Amino acid sequence: MWNEFKKFAIRGNVIDLAVGVIIGGAFGKIVSSLVNDIIMPLVGLLLGGIDFSNLSWKVGKAVVKYGAFIQTVVDFLIIAFSIFLFVKLINKLYERVKKQEEMEETEPTLTKEEELLTEIRDLLKQQRETM
């Protein structure tokens, strides 16, 4: 069982996934800081000095922090848009590689007669040039 787990854990897909999760977590923190510390204060300033992080409704003892929710929605939208752009870039690169592979496959292959004729032509050109 241990050997099976080692094979599973060492496979490229699992390691790629782990790296993706770690980088995704770090990227999420960067985006959260961008939203909380830069974007939302500027939006609040444009809307008359509103501090979104403190916006809330008080209903009895319950406090509904809708300002924090707005910040989280903006955070999500930025992350989702970034992922969309990244996936779009990866798909474009994949299509480019696929087209290049198809072009390489469709390059005409010469028959033996054509190869011989090409060699003869090249030899004749060389002879003319040396004369």
Curated annotation (Swiss-Prot):
Q: Which keywords annotate this record?
A: Cell membrane, Ion channel, Ion transport, Membrane, Transmembrane, Transmembrane helix, Transport
Q: GO terms for CC?
A: plasma membrane
What is the protein's membrane topology class?
Answer: Multi-pass membrane protein
This one is known as Large-conductance mechanosensitive channel
Domain of life according to the entry: Bacteria
Traced from the root, the source organism's taxonomic lineage reads:
Bacteria, Bacillati, Bacillota, Bacilli, Bacillales
| Annotated gene | mscL
> What organism, scientifically named, is this protein from?
Geobacillus thermodenitrificans (strain NG80-2)
State the protein's purpose.
Channel that opens in response to stretch forces in the membrane lipid bilayer. May participate in the regulation of osmotic pressure changes within the cell.
Give yes or no: UniProt keyword Transmembrane helix: yes
One Gene Ontology term of the molecular function aspect:
mechanosensitive monoatomic ion channel activity
For this UniProt entry, which segments traverse the membrane?
A: 8-28, 30-50, 67-87
Q: Which family does it belong to?
A: Belongs to the MscL family.
What PROSITE patterns does the database record attribute to this sequence? MSCL
Quaternary form?
Homopentamer.
